[in-house]
A protein has these predicted regions:
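C-terminal domain-boundary segment and adjacent tail
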Residues: 41-131
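Active-site-adjacent pocket scaffolds in enzyme catalytic domains
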Residues: 1-64
Length: 131
């Protein structure tokens, strides 16, 4: 988990030279990562609570999922995948993501691609200071 917290870097979008870095969201203060593995293993109510805190604090939430997470890994012991990866994989992950999206849409949050998000953030970061 420590490798996902990047304690020496900003929690939110930042520039490295001319490159916009868009890190996956972590909670304010303790920097708990809210990426795919958290969605697999946290109770859904807790994951949603943490996502809502990030949205209130940062104004946006960034996460990602891998295609294999939607495959029923639990049905294949020969893969020898750890429980934290098999947990809620396949249909379970599909249902969790569906619930998350529906709840966020009910609250009026917009969804967009990384490219769309990058365009908005780059415009904000490149806006001249108004004084």
């Amino acid at each position: 988990p420590g490798r996902y917290m990047h304690l020496s870097e900003p929690r939110t979008c930042f520039m490295t030279g001319k490159l916009l870095q868009i890190p996956a969201s972590v909670t304010p203060w303790i920097r708990f990562p809210l990426f795919w593995l958290s969605c697999h293993n946290l109770p859904m109510w807790l994951y949603q609570l943490l996502v809502n805190r990030v949205l209130k604090h940062d104004g946006y939430f960034v996460t990602y999922f891998h295609p294999w997470e939607f495959y029923p890994l639990g049905e294949h012991p020969e893969f020898k995948m750890p429980f934290i990866i098999r947990n809620h994989s396949g249909k379970g992950m599909e249902e969790r993501l569906d619930v998350l999206i529906r709840k966020l849409k009910e609250k009026g949050y917009a969804f967009m691609t990384y490219s769309e998000f990058a365009q908005i953030k780059l415009a904000e970061l490149n806006k001249p200071d108004e004084k």
